[in-house]
Regions:
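TPR-repeat structural position
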Residues: 17, 51-52, 84
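Long, ordered, amphipathic alpha-helical scaffolds
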Residues: 76-173
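Solenoid-like repeat scaffolds
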Residues: 25-32, 58-68, 92-101
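Short coil/linker segments at helix-helix boundaries
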Residues: 1-14, 33, 39, 93, ...
Length: 173
């Protein structure tokens, strides 16, 4: 299984995305439990190739849970397809699941690779933190390189969401 996973990673590094998708799908058939996190890489590959149908099917196959590494690529996929309302919806869902989404988008929009790497966990990542977002970023730089303005757009959107929440008056009882 590990040899197949290494092959899968090598295909991605070589830019052979269609072959990588085929290998990733094969890996998921071999290991339904997905102890290696292939589903997350596969989701990023589907976003890269703008394969909405397979991306949504993969999300549903694993319970449709609100997970950082599922929601982030879906937001990028809809951004790439010029479906900004859906992209915003997934960004909002991502921000609810991962409290550091806005911070991550700010650092990525500034292309602050040093600060991003400083946020990386030494022994993996804690779910729901910037560490998880950085891990997703470092494992799928091809997707972020293909959408250089996504992070700026996402940060601006999340910033306006935060500002509008602050402006709303609290209901008095």
């Amino acid at each position: 299984m590990r040899v197949c996973y290494t092959y899968f990673q090598t295909l991605i590094e070589c830019g052979m995305m269609r072959c990588a998708i085929n290998e990733g799908e094969r890996l998921l058939k071999l290991s339904e439990g997905d102890s290696l996190g292939v589903r997350y890489q596969l989701m990023h590959l589907y976003a890269y190739t703008e394969d909405e149908m397979h991306a949504l099917a993969l999300h549903q196959k694993y319970g449709g849970y609100e997970e950082t590494q599922m929601l982030l690529p879906l937001a990028i996929l809809y951004y790439k397809q010029n479906q900004f309302d859906k992209a915003k919806d997934y960004l909002n869902r991502l921000a609810k699941v991962n409290r550091d989404t806005k911070k991550f988008m700010r650092l990525e929009a500034k292309h602050d690779g040093y600060s991003l790497r400083m946020e990386q966990g030494m022994y993996g990542y804690r779910p729901g933190t910037i560490e998880e977002l950085v891990d997703a970023y470092l494992n799928s730089t091809y997707l972020f390189n293909a959408t250089p303005y996504f992070s700026q757009w996402a940060y601006q959107y999340l910033r306006t969401q935060t500002a509008s929440k602050k402006k709303k008056p609290k209901n008095e009882e």
